[in-house]
A protein has these predicted regions:
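Short beta-strand segments of immunoglobulin-like
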Residues: 283-290
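A beta-strand/beta-hairpin structural motif
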Residues: 297, 328-355, 383
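Beta-strand-rich binding/interaction modules
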Residues: 293-302, 306-321
């Protein structure tokens, strides 16, 4: 059986069709045989063979990963107690039995447990909130919890504030990850995009969390907030600055969108200014690029100050879109300290290989270098088929 973990492979950020094909195969005959046996050991009336037959009835082979997961939830429900609290109690027993059989936490295959709560527990707040605490210690509930935030709003957020103080790091992470206004590949939470102040106590409680796994979630939550409410993140950056190396790390990662945007206040916060940082010999070596090949460019950078300077170095590709306009995408090169009068030469390649997450359009594109948030002259290149 595949043992793919959410902590090392976030399925919702994977774009390769080859990898997605592999992931859907975690739902195999072997998996359902072993899972069915684990259920039967704690649920005497469970008919393992009927369960497996129901799983494979119809077009299972044609289903992709998410559809297989959802299908598993629906079929499992047919074999569970129809009383929701009783079903949740049974899920807890199944999970404990899986742990005894050496299934460790964050095994992606079992995400249907979280999905079960989302699908069948939305009208039972108390039971579901308790279920999330137990299930997320085995498999993340960050996606399943979001409909509850939308429906119950502050009541759910109050629960999540409690979770942020929980002894288990998976539960603490759920309080942050589940309340992100813009969690990728999940439904957005409009009222938190508009005003995220209700979730700030969660982030405050977690800013010094001993788990990097949790702190990374706090940073991602802040980055979500920054996209709609930059001033809130700027104020938090000032408030948390220098509290600890970990907190400084959270702020730096949480402000990454603001840094890419060249937001003046966050650049000032980090002492990033471009005076006397000279760009020269900026050249596109491949002015005509074929889709599938690389754009190649080079430039020199010289710190002409009499003191060392931190330089955040980026470049922007202005992609031509379907309607003819250009859309800017910023890529980070480095952020490091340059000594007085230090000169460096930079050579870079930018891929135009076909990927599932970007559609390329032939025609004139643009390229620029960004030094501490300040964009340089813009050069053009042509993309051809």
């Amino acid at each position: 059986m595949f043992n793919i973990k959410l902590e090392t492979l976030n399925i919702f950020e994977v774009h390769s069709n080859k990898i997605m094909g592999l992931i859907k195969d975690i739902y195999s005959v072997t998996f359902y045989e072993k899972f069915g046996q684990a259920v039967a050991e704690v649920h005497p009336t469970f008919d393992k063979q009927k369960f497996i037959d129901a799983i494979y009835k119809g077009d299972f082979a044609q289903k992709e990963w998410k559809d297989r997961m959802k299908h598993t939830t629906v079929v499992l429900h047919q074999f569970m107690p129809q009383n929701f609290p009783e079903a949740v109690a049974l899920i807890d027993k199944i999970i404990e039995n899986l742990k005894k059989n050496n299934y460790t936490d964050s095994n992606l295959a079992f995400i249907f447990f979280a999905d079960y709560i989302e699908m069948y527990g939305l009208d039972d707040f108390k039971t579901s909130a308790k279920a999330f605490v137990s299930i997320t210690q085995f498999i993340s509930c960050e996606f399943a919890v979001r409909p509850f935030v939308l429906k119950y709003k502050q009541e759910m957020i109050n629960e999540m504030i409690k979770w942020s103080l929980h002894e288990n790091h998976h539960v603490r992470r759920l309080s942050s990850e589940g309340s992100r206004p813009r969690l990728p590949w999940a439904m957005a939470i409009p009222f938190l995009k508009k005003d995220p102040t209700s979730i700030l106590p969660i982030l405050e409680n977690l800013k010094n969390d001993p788990s990097e796994y949790v702190r990374r979630s706090v940073a991602n939550n802040l980055n979500d907030i920054a996209k709609d409410n930059p001033q809130i993140v700027l104020e938090i950056a000032k408030k948390w600055r220098g509290k600890s190396p970990e907190t400084d790390g959270i702020i730096k990662h949480g402000a990454r969108t603001l840094l890419k945007q060249g937001h003046p206040e966050i650049l000032s916060h980090y002492g990033l200014e471009s005076t006397n940082i000279e760009l020269s010999n900026f050249e596109i070596k491949t002015p005509v690029v074929k889709i599938g090949d690389y754009l190649q460019f080079q430039f020199d950078l010289n710190n002409k100050n009499n003191e060392a300077k931190t330089v955040r170095l980026e470049y922007a590709v202005h992609y031509k879109k379907a309607k003819g306009h250009l859309a800017k995408k910023v890529f980070k090169i480095s952020e490091k300290t340059y000594q007085p009068n230090q000169l460096i030469k930079v050579d870079r390649n930018q891929s135009f290989k076909i990927i599932t997450t970007r559609v390329f359009h032939t025609g004139i594109h643009q390229l620029s270098i960004i030094i501490n948030g300040t964009e340089s002259e813009v050069l053009e290149f042509e993309l051809i088929s």
